[in-house]
Amino acid sequence: MHRNLTLSVGLIVASLWPLHSQPTAVSFRAVQSELFAAPNSLVNAAADIDGDTDLDLFVGFNGTPNRLYRNDGGTFTDVAVAAGLNAARATRAAAFGDWDGDGDSDLLVGYAPGSGPVLTLYRNDRGVFTDVTSSARLAVDAGAVRQVVWVDYDDDGDLDLFVAFRDRANALFLNDAGTLTDIATSIGLADTRRSVGAVWADLDADGDLDVVVGNMDGDANGVFRNHNGRFTDVAEAWGLASGGQTPRTAVNGTVRPCVGDVNNDGRLDVVMANYGPPALFLRQGDGWSDVASAWGIAVDSRSDACVLGDVNHDGAVDLYLNGTVTGGRNWPDYLYVQTSNRLVDQIPQNVAAVPADHGALLLDFNGDGALDLALTGQGPHALLVNTLDAALARHSVRVQVVDSRGRANKPGAEVRVYRAGTRQLLGMALVDAGSGYNAQSVAPVHIGLASANRVDIEVTLPAGGKREVTYARNIQVDGRRITTVKVP
């Protein structure tokens, strides 16, 4: 069990971009390879299911029993049978979220059609999960589920559920005291394009969470701007519809959109993992510009996942892209380490050798302060621990954003870290509101630091057309600890 630090918190804004001439090398070590040897995994999702502050890991498979790995100080045990999560159905999506507001992370699982409901909701009671789909009135028996996201759409403290479908209209299930009702048509989110990935964030900084939807098979992407609870597709106007691919064709598309602050200017950028070269849209002025070529990542590829995070604690956000396995070809994976406004591939050989092509998570699974890598794919799935030097691994902050009752139900909240007592921005990250295709987490936000021993943390909560800010000041830097910030 790791030590928690709970603090109360207000706001400040500014930035200073660190320059890096030579990126710190990164390496990862596989753990418990025998345990993670089962093939044909598609989905992973992480959360602390038992309240010990360690991140546990759910892995969904393509027709063999699903697994739930309980994490005890970095050692994993499959407890799926005892927990009630060992269904042997083709699993295409999973997301943890506190559906009933009791403080535990419940689990929504999306299954392939043909053998029962395609959406199943499991209530968590101290690590034991019970099927409550019927009591939640969540009756969906058809549809190719691709991405599920818990988000508080109406800012009432209950987590609502967004579902991206590849073959039917997308859905937004409003949570009213545990009852889930699809209201997507009435609010403008029932898009019928072939959707696979989705992420929510306040892209235009107006106090409402918008949603980026990645679409496949030549369909343009959707970017749905939220205005007073109604959504308008502004992807074309904002330059994000093509995902960096013009023209869109039947063989290309966007699988997973990722949102974060890539260039450390305090504003949200968008990465798109594509069938085709990836895109990197930096927020510039009132819009976004694709700088993938200038940043060195516009190479032909077929990627199922993108993940942002500082893997080497140099203060700059790095990018993991995994290549799909299709048509007998294993497209390459990339670990782009950022240096001097470029992204340079430094993927270790043992990471590249994992046939990962779906779920990917960068999270701190062993509590040392550094980001580890969890992968799924057609071969063995894998958990790879970051081997940063212990002192360097601690040079980060981990921030858990909770409400006034201590519940981790604020997806889309923005966390910024400043050098203590100054307005020098050291890093920014989002509370997970849709990690993208086949991956999700309820986990502390991680920000790596190149310098600074003490920091100020500020949390911006977009809700109801306002951007409420809270802060924690003069926090000692130690990534082994979790700083809990309570927001309204």
State what each model feature region is.
Residues 21-39, 70-89, 123-143, 174-193, ...:
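Blade-edge motifs of beta-propeller repeat domains
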